[in-house]
Amino acid sequence: MAPSATGLVSQLSSKLSVSSSKAAAAAAAAPASSTSSKTANNKQQLDSEQVIALEHATSAHNYAPLPVVLDHGQGALVWDPEGNEYIDCLSAYSAVNQGHCHPRIIKALTEQATKLTLSSRAFYNSRYAPFAEKITTLLGYDMVLPMNTGAEAVETALKLARKWAYMKKRVPEGMARILTVENNFHGRTIGIVSMSTDPSSRVGFGPFLERVGPVLDDVSSPENPIPAHGGPIRYGVIEDLEHALQEVGHETAAFLVEPIQGEAGIVVPPHGYLAQVQELCKKHNVLFICDEIQTGLARTGKMLACSHEEGVRPDIITLGKALSGGVYPVSAVLADKEIMLCIAPGEHGSTYGGNPLGAAVASEALDVILDEDLCGQADRMGKRFRAELQAVADANPDGLLTEVRGKGLLNAIVIDQSKSKKGRSAWQLCLLLKARGLLAKPTHENIIRLAPPLVITDDQLTRAIDIIKNALLEVETIDEIPGDDGAHH
């Protein structure tokens, strides 16, 4: 059984001390000619146990990582400090669609880093404007507003929608609403978690913004519930949004939605839902905002996930994650001029947004998606992936695996712990997958998101499928799960 984080912390000082002593002794014994070696070669690299213990002792505990340490990666593969190889089936939450350390993107980064990294938007720089032209042309919008993180992009879209509502729709000042759906995830800032229905995002963090989210408590009542079922606006249920807009559409600035819910467990709405959303938003003069941060840029087999429905073109889209290929934080908000120009100079911005380094990286990241046909790759690989895992579920209806869902290479499997003869959980299955050479992580306890880099090869995908199939059987027979110290909660 792997030692707990607490036990690892107690071992850390002695291990580091031994490493330092060995390094010092080696340096003293080395010939004089070796003193010109790179400094990095003289440093003793921490092993995985030391890294985990050190992070546990010195970093905030706002994540509960799988007990694996990543040291380097290439394409769909990553390695730990001990040299163990893994197939990455999380892709940093779909940030490395182009694969780890794609050579073209790394080259763009290093070349630009020797020229100019940051100018701020106080001045023009030579890399941002060509990037802006490229992304707006590619996705069919007039303008882009650059930011750094996905949450920043969403916050920017919310501000933009409210400003539009006051300037163009003439909603009374202070009254503009933003509607969302139940189980949404758009980030973790106060503004964004104000819209959340996830207790872990809200408890202990209030008070929250008013007039945002899927709940209409200020106008709903037991006698006249809005929506009609008396709860939050449900994802994929167009009647809920229709009822809400009938009641508050006149003061609603925007409806914000994920084309596929990611953190909720890769929830795909009924086909036609987004087209119906668009129609309702147009009817009530409400902006349709699509959060494509996790789903966009080829992940689902289309450049934008909303494009799986013909004719769907949101008023505003947000992008992030794979916009830089996982190399540098870059995000963006896209809209047409009528909306984008509602924000005037000085009203919104970011020191790093639109910086030349980020623009160079993002521009190359987009080119890689197009040149390597990653949309087609995601579509082909995803269909095969789901078909093979669905066959496992169909062949064993009483087994742990109860559902396979997704689009492209954004997929999830649903695990029913109550069907496990040994009471095994999705977390324990992920520990076993890790021990067998594949990395994935549960969301909402019983769902495992499976989203490898889009550059994964046929052989690697075959290996990933085999590992998952075998682990689903082995988890029910093995007496002890490797690395399971019972610390996860």
PLM feature spans:
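N-terminal mitochondrial targeting presequence
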Residues: 1-38
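Conserved N-terminal phosphate-binding loop of PLP-dependent enzymes in the Aspartate aminotransferase
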Residues: 9-12, 34-489
